[in-house]
C-alpha cells in the first residue's frame, strides 16, 4: 500500500489513472506539466519520483510514457473536477481529442446514452477535416466497398441534415445503421456498399432520424 500522498501527488495520480482508463496509456511528463500548470516537465518528474518512492507507481527510465500504476487492477474514481478538467486540458495541449466510443446501441435510447459508451479514445485532431463528436464501432460488412469494415471505428459528427451521397448514421425505428444517404423525389433510401445487402427504403410508417454524418474512419489495428 502506498504511503500517504500530498494533495498535489494525489492529483497527479488521479490524472494518470484517468488518462490510462480513457486512452489506454499514461501521460508524458510534458503532458502532466501542461495539464497541471507546472513550469516545466522537470517539476512533473519530481512529483513522479516522489510517487514512486511512496509505492504508488513504478517508473521506467528512458521512456517518455514509462509510468506504471502499482494498483493497475483497482478502479478508483477520480477526485473532484480537478483530474477530469486536467485531462481535458491535457488533451487540448497535445492536439488530441477524447471521443466517446459507442458500442451496441439499445433500441429506443439515445446513441450517446451512458450505457452505450464503452470507453473514451484519444485520437489526433489532425485525422479529421471536421471535428467528430463520437466514434461508433462498426458492426457488419454492409459498407465493405466503401472501406468500412467490421470492427472499424467510424468518426461521426452530430447532424440532423445530410447531403445526397454522404455516409450517415441513421436511426430507423429501433435500429441504428451506417449507410449512404440518397434522396430522390421525396423518397429516402439508405444504400449499402456491398452487393450482398439490399437498399433500405424509408417509408412514411417508419420513424427515421439522422444521428450524424461520417467524417473519418479509424482502423482498429491503429489503436494497438
Swiss-Prot record:
InterPro entries named in the record: LexA (IPR006200), LexA-like (IPR039418), LexA/Signal_pep-like_sf (IPR036286), LexA_DNA-bd_dom (IPR006199), LexA_repressor (IPR050077), Peptidase_S24_LexA (IPR006197), Peptidase_S24_S26A/B/C (IPR015927), WH-like_DNA-bd_sf (IPR036388)
DNA-binding region: 29-49
Site label Cleavage, positions: 107-108
GO molecular function: DNA binding; serine-type endopeptidase activity
Catalytic activity: Hydrolysis of Ala-|-Gly bond in repressor LexA
One Pfam short name: LexA_DNA_bind
EC number(s) from the headed UniProt entry: 3.4.21.88
Complexes and interactors: Homodimer.
Protein name according to UniProt: LexA repressor
Encoding gene (name): lexA
Amino acid at each position: 500500500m502506498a504511503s500517504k500522498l500530498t494533495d498535489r501527488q494525489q492529483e497527479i495520480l488521479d490524472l494518470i489513472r484517468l488518462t490510462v482508463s480513457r486512452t489506454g496509456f499514461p501521460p508524458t511528463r510534458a503532458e502532466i506539466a501542461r495539464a497541471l500548470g507546472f513550469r516545466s516537465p522537470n517539476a512533473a518528474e519530481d512529483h513522479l519520483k516522489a510517487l514512486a518512492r511512496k509505492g504508488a507507481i513504478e517508473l521506467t527510465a528512458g521512456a517518455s510514457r514509462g509510468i506504471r500504476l502499482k494498483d493497475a487492477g483497482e478502479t478508483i474514481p477520480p477526485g473532484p473536477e480537478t483530474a477530469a478538467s486536467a485531462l481535458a486540458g491535457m488533451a487540448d495541449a497535445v492536439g488530441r481529442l477524447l471521443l466517446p466510443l459507442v458500442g451496441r446501441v439499445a433500441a429506443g435510447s439515445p446513441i450517446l446514452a451512458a450505457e452505450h459508451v464503452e470507453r473514451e479514445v484519444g485520437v489526433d485532431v489532425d485525422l479529421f477535416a471536421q471535428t467528430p463528436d463520437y466514434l461508433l464501432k462498426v458492426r457488419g460488412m454492409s459498407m465493405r466497398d466503401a472501406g468500412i469494415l467490421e470492427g472499424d471505428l467510424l468518426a461521426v459528427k452530430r447532424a440532423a441534415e445530410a447531403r445526397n451521397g454522404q455516409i450517415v448514421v441513421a436511426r430507423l425505428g429501433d435500429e441504428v445503421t451506417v449507410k449512404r444517404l440518397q434522396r430522390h423525389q421525396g423518397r429516402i433510401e439508405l444504400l449499402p456498399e456491398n452487393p450482398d445487402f439490399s437498399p433500405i427504403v424509408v417509408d412514411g410508417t417508419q420513424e427515421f432520424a439522422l444521428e450524424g454524418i461520417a467524417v473519418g474512419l479509424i482502423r482498429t489495428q491503429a489503436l494497438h
